[in-house]
Amino acid sequence: MNDALAPTIAVIGGGQLARMLAEPAAALGIPLRLLAEAEGLSAAQVIPDHTVGDYRDLETLRAVTKGCAVVTFDHEHVPTDHLHALEAELAVRPGPEALVHAQDKAVMRARLAALGVPCPRNAVVTSTAEVTAFGYPCVLKTTRGGYDGKGVWRVDAAEQCADAFAAAESAGVQVLAEELVDFRRELSALVARSPSGQVSAWPVVESVQRGGICAEVVAPAPGLDPGLAVQAQRIAMRVAAELDVTGVLAVELFETTDGRILVNELAMRPHNTGHWTQDGAVTSQFENHLRAVLDLPLGAPDARAPWTVMVNILGGDAETGRLYDGYPHALARDPRLRVHLYGKGLRPGRKVGHVNAYGDDLDDCLERARHAAAWFRGDLGNESE
């Protein structure tokens, strides 16, 4: 064996996050081996060494990871028992003892409370009566499996609780009640951490959600009090260290109307709120995730420009939305625009790509990114049709 060859990283999950690991992996000469849920998925289009199979099957996981130095993830859904089994064969990063805090909201809330990390008031509930005792209005969440607004219900009265309990029973999970937070906006603190303990923290960003889905990210968060920015970064770094996270950790936060920071969610993988780093930071979240899981020195997280705006391209109608055919207008109008498409077909509300616009003027960056995303979505240019 040639010791100069980089070790192979196994990646579980065929979505766009795995896809976006491929470019920095190629630049660093790091081979990737992918387990995708189906042929033709986003990551399978760009990672030749891929297998189609079920991540819930341990033998499939063992076959894909055989000969790899480390395994990492596009999502948090691999069964915890399987992760423990894989640990006997290769490095699992992040490890199952860390990852369970991103998989199970009840486990996450209990651990953060033990650490004294500020969170919304919460409780596991088993009946409508317990929700009523907790108090309305509140938010009900299934403890596992929810994302992009799925598995989350706002409830204002007892008769609205049935859907949450039915979904939890069907999935075999619990229901978590959380107070309805009066927040000014949502923030995200993103860090990368290596097994040796090195940590790299990007600027805290503002995340704009629509319909439970991340629509825009502004880096850095405009007008954020410097003290709150430091607090948010310190929370992310402390959580990464206390939970022994390896790779990228995203800490989604509420900035409350009375000036506090509360932790909303954790994700232990590259995250939508970090896509701006591909073009707006010295080192992207995807490159630092690869460096971290291999315990290589981490890259600088510094911003390349005063402002970077990321806007998701959410698929519009197949008749009016654009993918490749949106390039002539978008690229001619803004030669500095950076476009990232995921190789997905159009479907209303589906994340099919994102754009990054960076520069010295925030309003200009917002206009450029929003215009481009609207053009690809088909909201512009079809008025006469």
Q: What does each model-identified segment do?
A:
Residues M1-V107, F376:
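ATP-binding N-terminal substructure of ATP-dependent carboxylate-amine bond-forming enzymes
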Residues G151-D258:
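Internal nucleotide-binding/catalytic subdomain
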Residues L5, R291-E385:
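Peripheral (often C-terminal) accessory segments that flank ATP-dependent C-N-forming ligase machineries
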Residues V230-V251, T257, A267-T320:
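Active-site "cap" helix and flanking loop/linker of ATP-utilizing ligase/carboxylase catalytic domains
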Residues E89, G95-V152, A158:
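A conserved helix-loop-beta module that forms one wall/lid of the active-site cleft
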Residues D54-L58, T80, T128, A158, ...:
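Structural motif corresponding to alpha-helix initiation and N-cap regions
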